[in-house]
Structure formats: C-alpha cells, structure tokens
From Swiss-Prot:
The lineage of its organism: Eukaryota, Viridiplantae, Streptophyta, Embryophyta, Anthocerotophyta. SMART domains: Ribosomal_L2, Ribosomal_L2_C. Residues 224-257 are annotated as: Disordered. One of its GO terms (biological process) is mitochondrial translation. This is Large ribosomal subunit protein uL2c. Disulfide bonds: none annotated.
Length: 277
C-alpha cells in the first residue's frame, strides 16, 4: 500500500500521511457478511468506564472474518480485495465452489483471481491453510490457532508474520511477531504468508481530529490532575509526582511492573518471552 504525505497547507496537514488505496480496493461490503456493532464507548452494562480514552468515532459496520478456515478441501477464488474500517489490513472476499462466500484476511501478494484452499494436503502457497505438522521449517505464517479448532488468534495484525523454527514430538516452536518464542500443537491450523499492509506503522496521524475519528479520546497526564483524581496530582504549579515510583490512577505500581498472572497454564509453553519483558 502506498502512503501519501501532505504538504504543510495547514497545521493539520503538516507531517500528516494517509493510505492511498489502489483501484482494485473496494469498500462496499457484502450485506450477509456484515452486522452493525454498537459502540460501547469503553463502558460496561452499568455505564461505568472500564476502558478509558474511548468514545465517539465514525460509525462502522463489522465484517465477519473467517478465522476458522473450516471449509475443508473446497477451493475458493479471491473475488475482491476490500477495505475494512475495523482493522489496518485489507480483507478478501472469497467465492467457494459450493456457492458460499466468506471474508479472509488479505495475505501479502495475493491477487484477485487467485485460488485458496484449507486442507491437510494443501500446497505450500500464499493464502492456503493447513496444520503446522504439514508445513516445512522456516515457513512464514499468520492467523495461527492456539487451540485446535478454535480459530486463528495469533499474528493477525497488519504486516504480522510468524515463523516455524523447530518441531519436536507433538509441538512446533514458533517465533511470533512480538519476538516471543512459543510452543504450539502441530494440529493447529495456520495460513501461509504475511498479513498485508506491512506499512501500517509508517503512517503519521498528524492531527488530533484523526484520532477522534478512530474513537480515541485524549489522554490526560496524572501530574496535571487534582490529588483526588490521581496519585500524581496536586502541588503548586508544575510539580513532580511526589512519589518514589510512578503509580496508576488506582494506586498500583506502573512502568515496569509485570501484569501477567502467575501460574498461568501457558507458562510451560513459552520458551522465551517477548522483547519488552
């Protein structure tokens, strides 16, 4: 995908960049594969804020993505490549031989008219889904299952790719996009290739309004709040936080404390934690 940069006509366009969609990318979705999603604005069923800095944004229609890839041994043809407002990558509308239509994530390099299939004996080509046991070492994959039959949960973001680096017994060793090395059952399904739009991180938002269109509200620093609102608040003028270590708004240690639960079932499956830990 091409990233187009604006000239500094106004303060909002200075250093701002947007994605320039190609002619093959369409945005009108299939009605039967969509449903309206209520914007909860970060509130729970009682109206209490459970996730801060969310609200507003443009209305979206959710596209049902086939993360399961459970159409076994039935070939499909890529009919369209479409824009999805709910994710940074594109999605592909696939026409299967039995007449069913489904959306899948857009693999890098996939073109309109290409065929895909989900099978244990599928060829090693971009867009095909098959178990890890039938993939050679070094294969680039995405949309990886953690539990067999549950659907892909790993490496689904724009530009994400995981690699098979070893196999032993019933488990395969994968290097995930975060740098984490993890063991996964070889019965799990994965899709070959890299997720499209690998330049998503190179876009510059440029102005506050673009963030509001995405449904993201401003983040206020705790040091400029009142003491009743944040442990860092208060003081005369510009003052330090007045603590030995930074705290969250609820008084818990921040910036460096590990938040992963102890004695989690997957601890024995993680060979090496991701880079930022």
């Amino acid at each position: 995908m091409v990233i187009r940069s604006y000239r500094a006509y106004t303060l909002g366009t200075r250093n701002r960049s947007v994605f320039e969609f190609e002619k093959k990318v369409r945005s009108k979705p299939q009605k039967k594969l969509t449903f309206r999603q209520h914007c909860k604005k970060g509130r729970n069923n009682r109206g209490i804020i459970t996730s801060r800095h969310r609200g507003g944004g443009h209305k979206r229609i959710y596209r049902k993505i086939d993360f399961l890839r459970d159409k076994k041994d039935i070939f499909g043809r890529i009919a369209t490549i479409e824009y999805d407002p709910n994710r940074n990558t594109f999605i592909c509308l696939t026409y299967y031989e039995d007449g069913e239509k489904k959306y899948i994530l857009y693999p890098q390099g996939m073109r309109i008219g290409d065929s895909v299939v989900s099978s244990t004996e599928a060829p090693i080509s971009i867009g095909n889904a098959l178990p890890l046991t039938n993939m050679p070492l070094g294969t680039a994959i995405h949309n990886v299952e953690i539990t067999p039959g549950k659907g892909g949960q790993l490496a689904r973001a724009a530009g994400a790719v995981a690699k098979i680096i070893a196999k032993e017994g019933r488990l395969a060793t994968l290097r995930l996009p975060s740098g984490e090395v993890r063991l996964i059952s070889q019965k799990c399904l994965a899709t070959i290739g890299q997720v499209g739009n690998s330049d998503a991180n190179n876009r510059t938002i440029g102005k506050a309004g673009s963030k509001r269109w995405l449904g993201k509200r401003p983040k206020v620093r705790g040091v400029v709040m009142n003491p009743i609102d944040h442990p860092h608040g208060g003081g005369e003028g510009r003052a330090p936080i007045g603590r030995k270590k930074p705290l969250t708004p609820w008084g818990h240690p921040a910036l460096g404390r590990k938040t992963r639960r102890n004695k989690k079932y997957s601890d024995i499956l993680i060979v090496r934690r991701r880079k930022n830990n």
